[in-house]
Regions:
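Activation targets extended, charge/polar-rich intrinsically disordered C-terminal tails
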Residues: 74, 78-115
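Short, solvent-exposed coil/turn elements at secondary-structure transition points
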Residues: 30, 146, 154, 184-187
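Catalytic Cys-His active-site segments of thiol-dependent hydrolases/isopeptidases
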Residues: 135, 141-170
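Loop/turn positions that initiate beta-strands
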Residues: 129-131
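N-terminal capping segments
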Residues: 1-87, 136-138, 149-151, 195, ...
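Short alpha-helix capping/helix-loop boundary micro-motifs
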Residues: 113-123
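Low-complexity, Gly/Ser/Thr/Pro-rich intrinsically disordered linker/tail segments
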Residues: 169-213
Length: 213
């Protein structure tokens, strides 16, 4: 199975952050907040059942898409397209056969970083766009120029672009310091294989982690 190019992963993540209405919904990999999906996701996880979070989900408009941190990455890799009429926004949950053929399995944030290659706690300025950035229970996508895309209930409560504190704060962005970074095994980095990030790629155009980030 051909893997998604890292450039494509970055562009899709940035597109979601900039051009779609999103909401942090635990266990959701891009579903539009239709009445049926609101019922589904206010019953699927104790985090979503909490009164305040359930109220947010119920108040979301039908053109809002739900994600959590690792499910943002999985949703993109599973073909999310922004469809407002498909249950998972166009993403397709992988079959056992698809996973055997190389598709991304349904792993949590910690499970994903455990499968990444070249995982390191240093070398932040040498990251290439499309790498995963991780802290316990939470994961995001490095997009270049010292920025990441992450879905978190913190700050804007949605898919958002933030500064990677390990590289440095950036004006106009909230800052998160991560613990490790590495290359996602279901992503093809051949388009970013030579040398560190130059910044030129930034801003073009059911989770098992805990939501305390």
């Amino acid at each position: 199975m051909a893997h998604m190019k890292s450039k494509t992963l970055v562009e899709k993540a940035v597109d979601i952050a900039k051009n779609y209405k999103t909401l942090y919904v635990m266990g959701c990999f891009g579903s539009p907040m239709t009445a049926a999906n609101k019922t589904r996701y206010t019953q699927n996880h104790s985090y979503n059942k909490a009164a305040a979070r359930a109220a947010m989900i119920k108040a979301a408009t039908s053109d809002t898409f739900g994600f959590d941190c690792v499910n943002l990455i999985k949703g993109i890799l599973w073909g999310w397209s922004g469809s407002k009429i498909k249950t998972y926004g166009g993403a397709t949950y992988p079959t056992t056969a698809a996973i055997s053929a190389g598709a991304c399995p349904d792993v949590g944030a910690d499970g994903m970083i455990a499968r990444c290659t070249g995982v390191s706690t240093t070398g932040w300025t040498s990251m290439v766009p499309g790498e995963a950035v991780w802290m316990s229970g939470h994961i995001g996508i490095y997009i270049g120029d010292g920025l990441a895309v992450e879905c978190t209930p913190k700050w804007e409560n949605k898919v958002q672009i933030t500064a990677v504190g390990n590289i440095g704060a950036k004006a106009g962005y909230n800052t998160r310091t991560w613990t490790e970074h590495g290359r996602i095994p279901w992503v093809d980095y051949s388009d970013h294989s030579s040398g560190p990030d130059t910044g030129r790629h930034a801003e073009r155009g059911h989770s098992k982690g805990r939501p305390d980030f």
